[in-house]
């Protein structure tokens, strides 16, 4: 990130504070318990919420046999994009599955 990119990114993040809080409140409403690890619906719900925030979202479903081989019923990876300038790319890795309640 270049010094000229920082103000644009900061302005974006500050301006999105309420949307971020609403996003997180909505996100935790979508079940993603693992087991059973059926996270495709959660990923789609997440993608829709992120698109509403102005991000470009690519959906990459993992083949069912590969998901099952890793103990998951379904997995969809999301790639998000938001351009702030000509600076370097910022990458973040996260997961949406959670342990069952209780």
Feature map (PLM): residue ranges:
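Acidic/His- and Gly-rich active-site-bordering loop/insert found
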Residues: 2-102
